[in-house]
Structures are given as C-alpha cells and as structure tokens.
C-alpha cells in the first residue's frame, strides 16, 4: 500500500493512495481533514477489538470505516447502484468506493499522517 501526503494551496493535507486503496485516501481527505481526534478514536477502537471477534464502525458523511482485529475496510456511503439503469455498452466504475487493508498497515498510515500534519 503506497501513499503520499501533500498540502494544497490552503494548507489542507491531501492523501493520495495507490490503486486499490483510493477509498482510504478519500476517507482521510473527506472524514479526517486534519482532525487528529478522529484518528485517536480509530486507534482506541483498534485497541478495543484486539484479541476479540468484535468489530468497530465509524459512519462519516461520505465514507464508513469498519475494522476488526485484522483488517480495515473503507466504503463509500453511496446508495446502491443498479446496473439495469445503465445504457447498453456502459459500465459502472466503483473501484474507488471500497478499499481493504491490514490493520497494522492502516495504523502505520495513521501514525505517518499525524506526523505529517503536526510538522
């Protein structure tokens, strides 16, 4: 999972993720937006599910983050899309709507994001 942190002209931190992990970058850009308390909540949740079969979920405005002791899933909160509505020859692109990664990799990303924001 490759990622890059940038600042836009307003100073807002932007996360760019490798292909297949775009939704995770969108989650940081849309749901975190530099609010480190969101990351603290996620880290506390990760500790709370460790060694159990419990799951934790945070529903945001655009994306929902779910985690268990092994994996993190970020999914867009969009309404389900019916492919029957598409014109012939058209397809629906949803690769940026769902991303999965290991919990340890995600927590490393959270740590690196926090460091970038604070420096």
UniProtKB/Swiss-Prot annotation:
It comes from the Bacteria. Belongs to the UPF0231 family. The lineage of its organism: Bacteria, Pseudomonadati, Pseudomonadota, Gammaproteobacteria, Enterobacterales. This is UPF0231 protein PC1_3552. InterPro entries: UPF0231 (IPR008249).
